[in-house]
Amino acid sequence: MSHPHFESPAALYAAYELASTKLYYPRGTVRCSADPMFRTRFARDLGCLLDVDPDVVAWLCLPTEFETALGPHVPDFLVDYEGGVRMYIDAVDETEIPEIAEGAALAGLRYRAVPRREVEEGFRLANARDMLRYARCRTPLNDRLRMLSALEEAGSLTIADCFQVFRETQPLTGISWMYLHRLISMDIDEAMIGPDTVVRRYPR
């Protein structure tokens, strides 16, 4: 997936222009296939969740525009899922706008509006934000192999146990990068990541 570089339609160009004036943290992404561009804080938050969704292969910001009864619309994301499903997604405050959903259907696009309450529910967003601070901090090979070997032997470790494994990088930096790159797994829904959080090898 990539952005068009020439002759962008007017609504798409306007969306790029607006997003280029915004800066939201964390800056790092893992599965965004082009430049991360967000028009709202809420869209950035949804992007955080896309990076920790095990079913997501890749995602793209502001992918296209399509006609609706309200005028041209540019969705926040195009998301490729496992199994070949491709969906256009908007971050919305409450519910989808019927005219936009209808416009997507008429254009032959699979579309979904994700409400704020779904994004902010539980601890997943807060944990994703914390880990994405380290998205660009690649865990050194020695530490990766030590961690995977320790998990192979023990079956699982707590975060506190993992502190003894890492030697070349800070433990939570290494753990975060390995989680984001699907080398290890943790439950990030039920509580904030802490010393007792259990770490396992990512299921293959």
Q: For each of these PLM feature ranges, what is it?
A:
Residues 1-204:
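Electrostatic, structured charged patches in enzyme active sites and in nucleic-acid/phosphate-binding
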